[in-house]
């Protein structure tokens, strides 16, 4: 890394949601969506791990819920899983609670009445049905349909 830094010039390129200002999917501003997620990522992780606007550029030509869902399932979710080491509670804080389902696990139900010293816990799973629903994306912004 040090040798590369001595030989080359590096310029910081932060996400630029402004290039998505004219992109909306079913009335939802993609620029606002990206900005909101990145503010949360900056607080929960750091600004160097914010999501780049390039992921959303295909929406300029094809601003559909199907394309947005594809971007989230193929790019955004795996990226957040990597950033947060599959800490789904933090991923839920970034995306709201529509995309990640929480299942409460009762240790007695799971293991019977054995004398097991376990606390009840929870497991997480991706709610793939949410990706096709524009309201799931609106929930990231904490707004209802008529407020976007």
Q: What do the PLM-derived regions correspond to, one by one?
A:
Residues 1-148:
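C-terminal regulatory/interaction module of P-loop NTP-utilizing enzymes
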């Amino acid at each position: 890394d040090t040798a590369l830094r001595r030989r080359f010039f590096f310029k910081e390129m932060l996400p630029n949601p402004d290039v998505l200002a004219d992109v909306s999917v079913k009335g939802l501003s993609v620029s606002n969506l990206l900005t909101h997620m990145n503010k949360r990522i900056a607080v929960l992780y750091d600004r160097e791990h914010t999501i780049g606007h390039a992921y959303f550029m295909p929406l300029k030509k094809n601003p559909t819920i199907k394309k947005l869902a594809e971007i989230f399932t193929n790019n955004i979710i795996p990226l957040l899983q990597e950033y947060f080491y599959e800490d789904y509670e933090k991923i839920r804080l970034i995306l709201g609670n529509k995309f990640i389902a929480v299942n409460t696990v009762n240790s007695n139900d799971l293991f019977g009445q054995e004398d097991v010293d376990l606390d009840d816990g929870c497991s997480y799973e991706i709610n793939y049905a949410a990706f096709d629903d524009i309201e799931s994306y609106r929930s990231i912004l904490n707004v209802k349909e008529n407020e976007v």
